[in-house]
Amino acid sequence: MVVIKNIRRIDHKVAADCYIEGKETEHFYLEIDVLTMEIVTNTLGEMNAYVFHAMQKLKALVLTGNKLPATAMSMWC
């Protein structure tokens, strides 16, 4: 699970600080372009399951059109 904190909208981008559950020292910053839905910044450097699920959750939050929450969680089975 990825804990997504400090979700914020910056112009046409959405950004968040992401923490890997159980590994709180491992975190990454993710920034997604809302128009193209592509990753602009990923401080983890690589695309893996954590980044993918955080990206999917951020996209889903943006597409709902509601106000962005401050915190969210991305879970998978």
Please describe what each predicted stretch is:
Residues 1-5, 44-47:
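N-terminal start-of-chain detector that recognizes signal peptides
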Residues 25-77:
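Acidic, low-complexity intrinsically disordered segments
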Residues 2-35:
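N-terminal acidic leader/helix
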